[in-house]
């Protein structure tokens, strides 16, 4: 039997054409998740060595404080993991050693022995304000120092609720819940991409768990988690959204929920909404993209309403905290001042500051036009496009940190860990499902 266009029905080339958009035959294409055997000692020993070298150099070059505490613990953890993987050829032991010494040990040490960094303090305070006043932001008259500002969107307060409800010590610290959320979300992302997820494949569950542990144990995520930076859960939610839209055309709603949660927490997630929507328009049609965008926006709106019910009474506080403060347009400036092009231009004076903001806006318009004129065709292309967009944003922003580049690095790492086997010859990030009655299409 053949279709009207002459392609055999049921063949990998068959596609549903709606409004000119060509949709893949999702029954025959699935995301490739790294198999459990690919995470063996032979592949991970060099990575542990690279991680150890990075942590050692970071310990020497860092200015001290929480960063150096993490670097010293992490160096020991990665060296131990590399030695254990090389000597005993195990997977679980070295991974758990790296996670324990690069994340758990320095995090607990910093919680019990060292002062918290600004991020956990801000999140915990916002949760207390939410419970007391229904608004996680201080009013303009109370913004006496830069520490008084809250540059996060309202839903970020959920990580501070344990502290606000009276938990103290490790269980009440924001860093514990940021790390737990990141591990769970990354495991869900890898599990969502497993090729035999629907069949309850034990190997897929194992691969998803160990892939998540390896990702979290890498310096890209473990350093910000240990010192209390809020970016890793946003990265994990973005990876989960990519896994959903790669897995099936029926999952953009789930992807929309994931991106919606991230967008309700931090503005750095907003570009992901635009990039994924553009990819869905090109791949699946405008209707699927509209469902994804609607799910994202509704989720964001609901979460903001729930986590900041008093916000409508003081909208100026929201603008002061999440718009003007990150752009350096308030009386007290953010300490995010890494010597990148945007900050260097902004530091030349008021004219330079306005020029930096204008250049950032021009870059945003340019990326938007690029998405419309040449949208990404698949998930790997979308991940790369998002990495480029975020890199431009962090380079050109008037207030920025080197640590923000964890976003593009993590996205490229996610794309690499879920890439297609080159031997399949299929689209990047996809591989043909096995069919005993028909050879794979090259």
Predicted regions and their residues:
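Primarily membrane-embedded glycan-assembly and transfer machineries that use lipid-linked glycans
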Residues: 2-242, 280-405, 415-421
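Membrane-interface junctions at the ends of membrane-embedded or membrane-associated helices
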Residues: 88, 245-255, 280-290, 416-442
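Metal-dependent active-site segment of extracytoplasmic phospho-/sulfohydrolases and closely related
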Residues: 242, 253, 260
